[in-house]
Amino acid sequence: MSRTRRFSGTRPGRSMAALAVVLVGLGGACQMFDQDDEPARTTPERPPGSRSEQPDATESPGAGEGIDLREAEVPDDHPIEHVVFIVKENRTYDNYFARYPGGEGTRTGQTSDGRTVELSVAPDVQEPDLGHSFFDGIIAINGGRMDGYDQILNGEDLAGYNSFTRKGIPNYWAYADNFVLGDHHFSSMYGPTFPEHLYTVGGQAADVVGNKLQTNAPGGYCDDPGETVYRFINMTKKEQNEVMRAERRVDLDTVGNFWEEVRACFDFEVIQDQLTANDISWHYYADEGSWMNALLAIKHMRFSKHWGRDITEEEQFMEDITSENLDEVTWVVPGPGVNEHPGGPSVCMGENWTVDHVNAIMRSKYWKSTVIFITWDDFGGFYDHVPPPQTDHMGLGPRSPLLVISPWAKQGFVDDTVTEPSSVLALIEEIHGLDCLTHRDCNASNLAQVFDFDQPASAPKDRKLILEERSCEGLPARISAQYEKHGDDAFRALGD
């Protein structure tokens, strides 16, 4: 099935005169270009992850002139033998770390009518869910102004203009105090969940721009021939440049006119293919049928020997740690109830899940050779004030937090290097000598800058940070009762 969609946007595009779009640069530097002018162009090192010709990137980090974010290298004698990539849901950097000392945060936000408002203290349970679709991301960014968060779904009352304090997420802040916090880590695209997760395994999303259109059940993807998604049509370079300009001026009609409806099952190369070809063990832990299970939408993975062996339910991760069966590269995708998705799940319970899993790794024999990356897949409708680079027609999207936890990570280090989820793929490729997959991971920072391999041999023992899980008292009665009765299954009906 492939139906070209001539789209009429549900939200009108804003009329904008020529204006300067500010794109953040390394170390806080900025570059500017007029929206109606053709920006400077560069060509990536390798072909893009798309059926289209390679788009021309705007003058921005990760694609800008003279910037090579992959020049940092991990030494050949590095001690990293295990990479654990934990992908949670729907938070921005400013939502979790706007108040964190030393980071690129803010206490205020900008609204579409020109006001400056104080960011309120974030609630543990955010209800209702906030808009975080592809269009919502474009609207929120508003051509780099970062003032459209009150124009997205359920954002009218400034519901997304809030941030946590240390008291609200003490253990995440403790990890930042003792390891690495990335404050210029951007989500892969404007949103939402499903295609964002595709980037975590493939450095691309097959140009998909939304979750499946059938919302009556969790994702079946390659198991369900009736499930469809919208994605960009196969575009020429000229058409991609037209789309990118339309995104900057929030012309949703023009952007949507390049979409088509296709089946939600794809067959592009993922990094697991390269790991398998090079005899590097890997495991992808995600609940079958979950909205977030990216490999369920990759045909040659879903119908392969890997399914049920290397791709299993999330809860098996803890069993494998206990039985000393951790693979070299691991993805862990928590399910509803503990993934911190707005609209029901508790951040406190989600943070406890993270602490439980990180503690298990620290107590295991693997800690001395492991790096853990924790990030959140998309912006979730929450405010963030730093304009993302526009590297192609998919994004980047607003910032999301990145925590790097390892005995070999720098201590209390705030990394201002521009990164994205493909940066984790770039590190895996650097460590194991693999080829990159798309222009995203080819050009992304490989995160080598967050490590200190000159630490003494006792570092793994000295740098364990076993944290206590918190009591999640004070939750709304409905949420508390559901969780007490059903545990992690309490929120599955809510979906993601």
Residue ranges and their predicted role:
Residues 31-34, 38-496:
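N-terminal pro-sequences and low-complexity stem/linker regions of secreted or lumenal proteins
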Residues 1-11:
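N-terminal secretory signal peptides that target proteins for export/translocation
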Residues 11-23:
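Sec-dependent N-terminal signal peptides
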Residues 26-29:
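C-terminal motif of bacterial Sec signal peptides marking the signal peptidase cleavage site
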